[in-house]
């Protein structure tokens, strides 16, 4: 059986950061700070979803400038991708939003979430389904 995240002793974060081969103590400290802050928010919510992402962004915007915050989202992206691959989480909410919008990159999703009206910004991101996907189920 695969262990699940979030884990109360936060050992996953420690192992994840150790696995990254970060060159400086400052980088490791930054990653741990970002990931512990994210886990704090996740633990206050029932589901790992868009609301968690919004809550983390709101909390973090008090601490960091928008450009720094958007840079920190990459830490969260890689962390969630890693845990999805390890089956420690069932889904990645950033990937879910990206797929719902039919876009390949995560940064536009984060920019939409950090905007004044995230729902409208996400709606503007939505692209039509890729060519050929509408007829796949017909046969």
Curated annotation (Swiss-Prot):
Source superkingdom: Bacteria
Keywords carried by this UniProt record: Plasmid
The protein's name: Uncharacterized protein y4gB
Native source organism of the sequence: Sinorhizobium fredii (strain NBRC 101917 / NGR234)
The organism's taxonomic lineage, starting at the top: Bacteria, Pseudomonadati, Pseudomonadota, Alphaproteobacteria, Hyphomicrobiales
């Amino acid at each position: 059986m695969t262990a699940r995240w979030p884990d109360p002793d936060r050992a996953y974060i420690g192992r994840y950061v150790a696995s990254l081969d970060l060159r400086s103590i400052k980088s490791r400290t930054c990653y741990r700070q970002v990931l512990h802050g994210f886990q704090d928010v996740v633990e206050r919510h029932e589901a790992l979803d868009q609301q968690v992402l919004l809550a983390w962004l709101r909390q973090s915007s008090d601490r960091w400038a928008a450009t720094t915050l958007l840079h920190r989202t990459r830490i969260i992206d890689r962390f969630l991708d890693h845990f999805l691959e390890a089956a420690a989480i069932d889904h990645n909410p950033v990937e879910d939003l990206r797929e719902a919008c039919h876009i390949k990159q995560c940064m536009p999703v984060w920019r939409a979430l950090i905007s004044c009206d995230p729902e409208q910004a996400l709606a503007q991101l939505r692209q039509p389904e890729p060519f050929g996907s509408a007829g796949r189920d017909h046969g």
